[in-house]
């Protein structure tokens, strides 16, 4: 009788062992799936946060057209006794920095990565055409612009300096979107109108719009921009806007409706 029960007992133990094994495997797999699901959820949330941050940077809240100043600019184009703002001025998502709409002294965005990438593409295209262009000046801090401007004033006087150099807080270079460009090997025409007459300068003027850049201070527009013609100073605004500004032969101020 005992011998007849032994196979039954062994079989029962084997069945129980199989059930336990199946339960353990199932539980392990289920935990793996849940962990993967949780990780995916975290990744998705991280991506959403990154996208929201990017959108916030590209489309700041203060994008409405600013109120026109009540005062009239002085002989150098600046508003008398103007204090620097606490927030930068954006119009339709475009950052503006000029003699009327300055930047906060604490505004320090560093160089804009999108502008740098577009610049690199433009310089590479120029090199394929035989022009070795280089951006010899880009982002500047408030402190550096202060030193630069003060040196120009000491050398040339304030009235002369105000025609070609921005006061600290008013410089496009502080936006991280502007670059001074010249041709290697022809440094003698850097920062001169003559650069615009060279084949390299003419190529740059003709093709900058294709990469999202505009000549920021064009000829015969000093009364609008506040600065003399600068054949070397280019500002990134994006391809669509750059093409429209170039086609219409207008300045950024005219495009934004602040002149």
Q: Where are the regions that the model predicts?
A:
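Extracytoplasmic cell-surface/polysaccharide-interacting catalytic and binding patches
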Residues: 2-259
């Amino acid at each position: 009788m005992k011998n007849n029960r032994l196979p039954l007992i062994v079989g029962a133990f084997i069945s129980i062992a199989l059930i336990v094994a199946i339960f353990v495997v199932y539980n392990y797999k289920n935990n793996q799936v849940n962990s993967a699901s949780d990780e995916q959820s975290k990744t998705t949330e991280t991506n959403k946060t990154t996208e929201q941050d990017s959108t916030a940077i590209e489309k700041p809240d203060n994008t409405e057209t600013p109120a026109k100043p009540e005062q009239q600019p002085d002989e150098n184009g600046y508003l008398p006794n103007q204090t620097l703002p606490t927030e930068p001025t954006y119009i339709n998502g475009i950052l503006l920095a000029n003699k009327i709409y300055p930047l906060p002294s604490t505004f320090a965005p560093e160089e804009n990565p999108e502008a740098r990438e577009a610049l690199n593409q433009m310089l590479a295209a120029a090199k394929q055409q035989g022009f070795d262009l280089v951006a010899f000046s880009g982002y500047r801090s408030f402190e550096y612009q202060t030193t630069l401007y003060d040196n120009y004033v000491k050398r040339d006087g304030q009235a002369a300096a105000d025609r070609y150099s921005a006061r600290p807080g008013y410089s496009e270079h502080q936006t991280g979107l502007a670059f001074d460009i010249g041709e290697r090997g022809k440094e003698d025409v850097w920062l001169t109108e003559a650069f615009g007459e060279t084949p390299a300068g003419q190529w740059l003027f003709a093709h900058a719009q294709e990469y999202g850049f505009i000549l920021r201070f064009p000829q015969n527009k000093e009364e609008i921009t506040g600065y003399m013609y600068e054949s070397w100073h280019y500002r990134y605004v994006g391809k669509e806007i750059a093409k429209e500004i170039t086609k219409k032969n207008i300045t950024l101020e005219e495009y934004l409706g602040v002149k």
